[in-house]
Design a protein with these regions (language model features):
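Zinc-dependent metalloendopeptidases
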Residues: 1-264, 268-309, 362
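Short, surface-exposed beta-strand/loop micro-motifs that present aromatic residues
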Residues: 33-36, 182-183, 254-256, 449, ...
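Short amphipathic beta-strand/extended segments with alternating polar/hydrophobic composition
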Residues: 36, 57-61, 274-278, 409-418, ...
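Short, ordered beta-strand-loop transition motifs
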Residues: 38-39, 104-106, 133-136, 248-249, ...
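Extracellular, beta-strand-rich repeat scaffolds characterized by small/acidic residue-biased motifs
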Residues: 260, 269-271, 280, 309-314, ...
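Calcium-coordinating acidic loop motifs
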Residues: 264, 308, 422, 493, ...
Length: 730
């Protein structure tokens, strides 16, 4: 009796609910069968070739319902590589692993056997024995009509396509025109190789050849979706940064499955315009000079191809939800981004580019074309950094052009819609804003930048040396490494990677050090400073607004700065000054110290330590096990509205009130004595007692440090938590 060598067991699966996918499954649950999976890994399936080593028909005897025929014989050695590749095409996309074994005299054969049989009618190429529990060891076996013996089974042949089709049956796929019928217009091999209908152009004669090519060389979009529904996806296939490059000399129908990396669909070799889409489950149409192929390059569902390159023709390229880089190259191209932060570069020609959602960047100004840029939603940028001459950009008018007649030929004349940011050239540019919040990068050269309305920002982040910029100056100013710039109606600045000097004006400014040890002075107004270097210096005058430092390093507020917010992911600390400070932590473990003044400390995430300091402070721990720490003299008044406040004490989070630095007995002079917690009991004129009293729905912590039976400090806890001794560090 013939024996399997690996799997041999069959399971079942349910319909997906998708009409396209379910058209490849039997409507009868008894025939909706698959090879049983292996725990914790891919489904292991073996295959073999009948009689390859001359073993006789004993493998038919006792084997069950294999075809009764006068002749069975094996494929040739020259045909095996193509058949192996057909099996691999399915293993590339599905979580199955095919292992080829050699049949032997002991009767060991694969789960799937492949061979020729005279029982197959000459009207058919071959057939596959349907896999089911009732079929016995014959299920999944593929028998080929003997007239195919001259075939090579290589890609671009009908035999290769037919073998992939039969292997699809062996994996459990049905025809899309039987039972659950695929929606109209999709019953052809562009969409599923389980169809009998060939797409236009699939029967192709290469110029100078008399040998026909069949251009479908992979399972297609719905085949991949269906087989992945049954077995799962192969998430190890093509996880690097792959380039899928196509050429006009070889037409093809193909679907791309790629499991990871940053990948590119490349049609740069084409001179005729192509339609390229990166949206999963859709098709691109490549244009060939000698044949018409409609929707010939598919991208499988669940597959993300990030980038696309066009050719020298007028291409239409559409992105997906990832951060795409779409390059039109030559021709009058139409580029459309998706939901991600995309980069669009039309190349030469008069291009039409739309960013879609996300913060998109349009590369412009290199070829003199008349391009159209529509940013859509998000913060979108037109970049003239590679322009060959100066540019004038007017975001109110929505135009960009060369600054003189001679320059237009180098820069072009462009149309801008929904663009909020401009990067200038290396020349003397004029950049004019809109009524909105615009961002400008003048670059090298002596630039004129007018923000007009809104809150506008000039970035010097690309400067090749330190810059000195003063927003209070109205004329041309020598910035140093970035030339003589004239800034009008600009509110915010970002420095370079060097040691800059940034000065604000009488408005509310944002000064961003970016990198380097910078000196920043905001002037009047409520200013915001971004600090990331221990060498950064912030200068503020008295009564010059209420100012904020956003810091990526541990920082102590200097004079006349009121507020501090810690940013980034590092465990850093923030310390206030003598003013009423608002100090916010980040998501890590922070130590926040208010010092003098009526401060508010907010820990955010992490296990934070909050130290209010003198005067009346408000402390908000946020998430995590926070510690509210007090020392002698750190308390406010002896009333609900004047004492220190803990806003969100949570025993569940692990919060503690730390009084270990407070001397519980100030009269004995022996040092730092610990408190004794007495619950809600009244003081008994013993120094060092700590009690909790609920007043107006608030838990009030009271301490007697001199033994007079009266509270010497109050701490208010909102929400009336039932405080116990374990909630304190005494």
């Amino acid at each position: 009796m013939t024996q399997y060598t690996s799997n041999g067991s069959v399971g079942s699966f349910a319909l997906s609910g998708d009409a396209f996918i379910d058209s490849l499954f039997s409507p009868d649950a008894a025939f909706r069968t698959k090879w049983a999976g292996q725990a914790g890994g891919s489904t292991q399936i073996s295959y073999s070739f009948v009689f390859l080593n001359g073993f006789a028909s004993k493998f038919v005897t006792g084997y069950g319902p294999e075809p009764t025929a006068t002749q069975h014989f094996g494929v040739t050695g020259a045909q095996i590589p193509g058949i192996d590749l057909a099996f691999q095409r399915w293993a590339d996309v599905a979580n199955v692993k095919f292992t080829k074994i050699t049949e032997d005299a002991a009767g060991n054969v694969g789960d799937i056997r492949v061979g020729y049989s005279s029982a197959v009618s000459p009207d058919y190429w071959g057939y596959c024995q349907w896999i089911s529990n009732g079929a016995g060891p014959a299920h999944g076996d593929i028998w080929i009509e003997p007239g195919v013996t001259t075939g090579t089974f290589q890609p671009y042949t009908y035999d290769f396509l037919a073998m992939m089709h039969e292997i699809g049956h062996a994996l459990g796929l049905d025809h899309p025109f039987e039972g659950n019928v695929i929606p109209a217009g999709y019953d052809d091999a562009r969409y599923t190789i389980m169809s009998y209908t060939q797409p236009a152009g699939n029967f192709y004669f290469k110029p100078g050849s008399t040998q026909a090519q069949y251009l479908v060389i992979t399972p297609m979009v719905y085949d991949i979706a269906a087989v992945q529904k049954i077995y799962g996806a192969n998430m190890s296939y093509h996880t690097g940064n792959d380039v899928y490059a196509f050429t006009p000399s070889q037409p093809v129908y193909q679907t791309i499955w790629d499991a990871g990396g940053t990948d590119t669909l490349d049609v740069s070799a084409f001179s005729l315009g192509c339609t390229v889409t990166l949206v999963p489950g859709t098709y691109s149409q490549l244009t060939y000079s000698d044949t018409l192929l409609d929707a010939n390059i598919g991208i499988a569902f669940g597959c993300t191809i990030e980038n696309a390159r066009g050719g020298s023709g007028a291409d239409t390229i559409t992105g997906n939800d990832a951060a795409n880089v779409l390059s039109g190259n030559g021709g009058a191209d139409t580029l459309t981004g998706g939901a991600g932060n995309d980069t669009l570069d039309g190349g030469s020609g008069d291009d039409t580019e739309a960013g879609g959602d996300g913060n998109d960047t349009f590369n412009a100004g290199t070829d003199g074309g008349k391009d159209s840029f529509d940013g859509g939603s998000g913060q979108d940028t037109v970049n003239f950094g590679k322009a060959l001459a100066a540019v004038t950009v007017d975001l109110t008018a929505g135009t960009a052009s060369g600054t003189a007649a001679g320059d237009v030929a180098k820069v072009g004349s462009d149309t801008l819609v929904s663009v909020e940011a401009v990067i200038g050239s290396a020349f003397n540019d004029t950049l004019l804003g809109s009524g909105g919040n615009d961002v400008f990068v003048g670059g090298a050269g002596n630039d004129v930048i007018d923000g007009r309305g809104g809150i506008d920002t000039v970035l010097y982040t690309s400067a090749t040396g330190p810059v000195t910029v003063n927003l209070a100056l109205t004329g041309a100013q020598n910035t140093g490494a970035a030339g003589w710039d004239t800034l009008t109606a600009v509110e915010n600045l970002s420095g370079s990677a060097f040691n800059d000097t940034l000065t604000g004006n009488s408005g509310n400014n944002v000064l961003n050090s970016y990198a380097g040890a910078d000196t920043m002075a905001g002037g009047l107004g409520n200013d915001i400073y971004a600090v990331d270097n221990a060498g950064d210096v912030v200068s503020e005058a008295n009564d010059a607004g209420r100012d904020l430092i956003v810091s990526w390093i541990s920082l102590t507020l200097g004079a006349n700065v009121e507020n501090l917010t810690l940013s980034g992911l590092a465990a850093i600390n923030g310390t206030g000054n003598e003013l009423a400070n608002l100090i916010n932590g980040n998501s890590a473990n922070n130590v926040l110290s208010g010092l003098d003044g009526n401060d508010q400390l907010q820990g955010g995430g992490g296990a934070d330590i909050l130290i209010g300091g003198a005067a009346r402070d408000v402390m908000i721990g946020g998430a995590g096990a926070d510690t509210f720490r007090f020392a002698g003299g750190d308390f406010g008044g002896l009333a609900i509205w004047t004492c220190d406040l803990i806003s969100d004490f949570s025993r569940t989070d692990g919060d503690r009130i730390d009084l270990s630095a407070v001397d519980a007995n100030s009269a004995n002079g022996s040092g730092n004595d610990a408190f004794a917690f007495i619950g809600s009991s009244a003081f008994s004129k013993v120094a060092g007692q700590l009690r909790v009293e609920v007043i107006s729905g608030l838990s009030i912590v009271q301490g007697d440090t001199n033994g007079d039976g009266l509270a010497d400090f109050w701490i208010r806890c909102n929400g009336a938590p039932a405080l116990a001794a374990g909630d304190f560090v005494l």
